[in-house]
Regions:
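Nucleotidyltransferase catalytic core that binds NTPs
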Residues: 1-141
Length: 141
């Protein structure tokens, strides 16, 4: 998967994927030439929402077909973090730029404590602008 020194990593359930996610991907891609999308597992969604609306395979297939996306990974951290996705990227890249959407900050993401002193991990916030749509709200409308 490599050939690049750094990657930008975005993570989420993307269940279902919507326009706000596209903004998130496009904004993130401006930070590095290699965009990796970490898609939460079905088990993660069961713990968070009760059940997935779309299977991991379906979500992965849709995201994988987007020209802006270079690689899709799955991950499942029982603590609600994306630490597993970050670790997967650190195996192949010298630097990981971990992006967070508009509603996330260093004081409300579990990954910050683990990686705040790791010079190979850089945190970016408000990527993709403010939260304009919510998958949960779309499903409950």
């Amino acid at each position: 998967m490599n050939g690049h020194d750094s990657c930008v990593l975005v993570t989420g359930g993307f269940d279902p994927i919507h326009g706000g996610h596209i903004d998130y991907f496009q904004d993130a891609k401006l930070l590095s030439t290699y965009l990796i999308v970490g898609v939460n597992s079905d088990e993660w969604l069961r713990r968070k929402k009760g059940r997935p609306f779309m299977s991991w395979e379906s979500r992965k297939r849709i995201i994988d077909q987007m020209n802006i996306v270079d690689y899709v990974i799955d991950f499942d951290d029982s603590d609600g973090s994306a630490n597993d996705a970050i670790e997967q990227c650190l195996k192949d890249f010298d630097k990981v730029i971990f992006c967070n959407g508009g509603d996330r900050k260093e004081d409300n993401i579990p990954e910050y404590e683990k990686y705040k002193n790791n010079k190979r991990v850089e945190f970016k916030y408000s990527v993709g602008g403010g939260k304009t749509e919510s998958s949960s709200e779309l499903l409950n409308a």
